[in-house]
């Protein structure tokens, strides 16, 4: 059993902790929290709580939450840390991981050079085998890589144009916006294009990102110029081989991200998460060598399976197909069309 520590127990960290706990080849040995809030109180019923350093202990003690020790203490026990701290903190934490000889996974908010390789389970699993420091790419980049990889394998990819309509913030964050505005990223391509190249090779891609006042999901409008001609049925068949992609249909009442997230609730998933990338089947248009489609990305959870697979790759516990199968089975990910 690989002993996993979680540094940062926010949107991603708490979901990774639950996912790791669902595996039969790894275990959570502790989580790091900075505040004795309601999240810490609930988490303490299930996980050992650690703090960044001793200066945080009194606040937890005053709140009646037991603290096992500091991050340094957790690193004495953990073989690997999943660093889900806020953007930029992973780079600052890395020297401690190196000092304690612990492997580490970083999330997409960190720069690529924080790790030996960036990671997506479908597109470059093998690059992470045996590595000590791996970065799981962002929710948006994961969403693009998930659906572009099958197209690349089936038809080849010449060029990708993607418009990313991004949610403003996560549902539990009341401090960010916009609230009543549309906020474009004026840098073109947005950072997602070079990020995609870290897991899909030197793919020719351009991305535009626009932030809108919603918290549910991101939506991507994607156009792909392919090397081989494609048909609608051929594209759908290519995606059918991958469980982490689902097809949804307007005719079944799924017109918006609201219905997609309601569908996730009906799955009975932990936190109503949708690990899969949802593609509106009616949006798929393949004419000669151009494929167009629209997809929705649940930004809180689509990277969670990748974190589990990255752990297996780094410890060479399983090959790509076996790891993905184990992760999907444990999280209830199965091929679905709605």
Swiss-Prot record:
It is an enzyme of class 1 (oxidoreductase). Pfam families: DapB_N, Gp_dh_C. NAD(+) binds at residues 11-12, 109, 167, 299. It comes from the Archaea. One of its GO terms (biological process) is glycolytic process. It catalyses: D-glyceraldehyde 3-phosphate + phosphate + NADP(+) = (2R)-3-phospho-glyceroyl phosphate + NADPH + H(+); D-glyceraldehyde 3-phosphate + phosphate + NAD(+) = (2R)-3-phospho-glyceroyl phosphate + NADH + H(+). Its EC number is 1.2.1.59. InterPro entries: DapB_N (IPR000846), GlycerAld/Erythrose_P_DH (IPR020831), GlycerAld_3-P_DH_AS (IPR020830), GlycerAld_3-P_DH_cat (IPR020829), GlycerAld_3-P_DH_NAD(P)-bd (IPR020828), Glyceraldehyde-3-P_DH_2_arc (IPR006436), NAD(P)-bd_dom_sf (IPR036291). D-glyceraldehyde 3-phosphate binds at residues 138-140, 169, 192-193. GO terms for cellular component: cytoplasm. The active site is at residue 139. Pathway: Carbohydrate degradation; glycolysis; pyruvate from D-glyceraldehyde 3-phosphate: step 1/5. Belongs to the glyceraldehyde-3-phosphate dehydrogenase family. Homotetramer. This is Glyceraldehyde-3-phosphate dehydrogenase. It comes from Thermoplasma volcanium (strain ATCC 51530 / DSM 4299 / JCM 9571 / NBRC 15438 / GSS1).
């Amino acid at each position: 059993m690989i002993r996993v520590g979680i540094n940062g127990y926010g949107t991603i960290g708490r979901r990774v902790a639950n996912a790791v706990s669902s595996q039969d080849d790894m275990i959570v040995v502790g989580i790091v929290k900075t505040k004795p809030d309601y999240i810490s109180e609930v988490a303490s019923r299930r996980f050992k709580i650690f703090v960044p350093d001793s200066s945080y202990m009194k606040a937890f003690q005053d709140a009646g939450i037991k603290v096992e020790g500091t991050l340094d203490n957790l690193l004495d026990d953990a073989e690997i840390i999943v660093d889900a701290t806020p953007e930029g903190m992973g780079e600052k934490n890395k020297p401690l991981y190196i000092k304690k000889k612990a492997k580490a996974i970083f999330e997409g908010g960190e720069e690529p050079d924080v790790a030996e390789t960036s990671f997506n389970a479908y597109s470059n699993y093998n690059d992470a085998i045996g590595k000590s420091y791996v970065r799981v790419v962002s929710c948006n980049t994961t969403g693009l890589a998930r659906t572009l990889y099958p197209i690349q394998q089936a038809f080849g990819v010449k060029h990708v144009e993607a418009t990313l309509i991004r949610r403003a913030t996560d549902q539990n964050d009341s401090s960010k916006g916009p609230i009543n505005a549309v906020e474009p990223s004026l840098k073109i391509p947005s950072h997602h294009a070079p990020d995609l190249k870290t897991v899909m090779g030197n793919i020719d891609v351009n991305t535009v990102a626009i932030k809108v006042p919603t918290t549910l999901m991101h939506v991507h409008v994607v156009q792909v110029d392919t090397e081989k001609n494609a048909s609608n049925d051929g594209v759908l068949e290519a995606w059918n081989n991958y469980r982490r992609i689902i097809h949804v249909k307007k005719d079944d009442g799924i017109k918006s991200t609201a219905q997609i997230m309601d569908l996730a609730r009906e799955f009975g998933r932990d936190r109503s998460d949708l690990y899969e990338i949802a593609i509106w089947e009616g949006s798929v248009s393949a004419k000669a060598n151009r494929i167009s489609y629209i997809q929705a990305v649940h930004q809180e959870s689509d990277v969670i399976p990748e974190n589990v697979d990255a752990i297996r790759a780094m410890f060479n516990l399983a090959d790509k197909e076996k790891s993905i199968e184990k992760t999907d089975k444990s999280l209830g990910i199965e091929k679905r069309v709605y």
